[in-house]
């Protein structure tokens, strides 16, 4: 195993947390948030809701069950992930496990992060960091390698993350009796899997698509990343739907 490079997470209030890299070695910046789940790092990393963020995992051991194979159902929905790629800028853990064991694992978390150009930082007291974020709110942050390039902080509210996370065209799933429109503001695949358990035809539409072109029976609005103030087109479409009589969930 090669020697790990030292790296530092710097928050925009000046706080510094030093550790070691285990993913792609490039400077990254994003909004720093935390996750208290004991498992599910694969699902979190591929969840479009976390696009552009640096995720802090408070559970101490991460990576011990590796990363599953990329597989999709016949309709194209991922089997083991929440999308077809990682959306985060980086992941911060207390203790990264280089070795892994799971019946469905095909590679380590570190190798996956390298392929996806995502930074992994280990050796951090993530619970102290999470406490700091809980007390002061989510912050802008950046991860810099020792002796490497320095970069500025990234403002998450200057980029339309929803537009980047959303699908680009209408996608149709199923052939059920009822038509449901899913407004994709950064939907994760588990929502699609859950909806398709019902007897419906699901129309997944881009965030700014005028879904009133479709004679739908129900409307589902997904969650997503970024600032909702950048989604004024979506808001206008939803306002028109609210004035109607079709059921809306979101």
Regions from the PLM with identified roles:
Residues 216, 223-250:
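Cysteine-nucleophile active-site neighborhood
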Residues 1-209, 228, 236:
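RNA-binding accessory domains that recognize and position tRNA/RNA substrates
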